[in-house]
Amino acid sequence: HGGKSSASAHQSEHALIAAMIPVLYPSTSAEIIEYGLAGWAMSRYSGAYIALKCVTDTLDFSSSFALPDPEGVYVFPSGRRPDLSLQPNRPPLVQEDVAVNHRLPAAQAFARANGLDRVVFDAPLRRLGIVAAGKAYLDVRQAMVDLGLDEASCAALGLRLYKPGLIWPLEPEG
């Protein structure tokens, strides 16, 4: 479909997952820029293409924010890894092995090292956790405001809020 706002729903995450492309999901205009820059750095580190999931509610509004440093200060996890660059002469099964066993874990390691997934607020005695990304994260925060729940009252209730920036593959250590 065309890259434009639309009245009909479209979804590409399944195609991106099938192509083994890590997906970042920003919730605000500022995060589109932040995750876009982080996505470039993640791509350099992991050798993978990186996608941004963008929904109409995030794109069809204006906002003001300070631009991050385009050079960025990213942590590149240490450790030995094979050559993860795309090489057209690699046999298909080797390409798949590199993607599944090296590129995707490298993208997860980059997300972990750079705090793309984060605990928004925590509770000393956790009873319930909410995981929300992108637009759904903003909806959850608005629902909390509507219910009169601030971070202190959520902590008292044992509620933890987790916001993944990398929605696929999920970073397992969070």
Which positions does each model-derived feature cover?
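Flexible, low-complexity linker and terminal segments
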Residues: 26-174
